[in-house]
Amino acid sequence: MTIINSISSLGKISNKNKSQANLNSNSTNSPNNVQGLNQNTGLVSSLLELVRGVTFALGLAVESVGL
């Protein structure tokens, strides 16, 4: 379960960094660039959710096998 917690923590840190990047860009960039950053953040979040799901499934499989 520590692997799952680690990945979850990484996701939160990554999302926090992306949010800060969006805040920084709001003051300097055009709305089109901000929208692009928001789309990238969504993609990163989706990939992290997918990795979390796969890791969770692997954790359950390992626990059920008893390795």
UniProtKB/Swiss-Prot annotation:
Belongs to the UPF0519 family. It holds the Pfam family Coiled. Transmembrane segments: none annotated. This is UPF0519 protein C. Residues 22-33 have a biased composition (Low complexity). It comes from the Eukaryota. Residues 18-37 are annotated as: Disordered. InterPro entries: HssA/B-related.
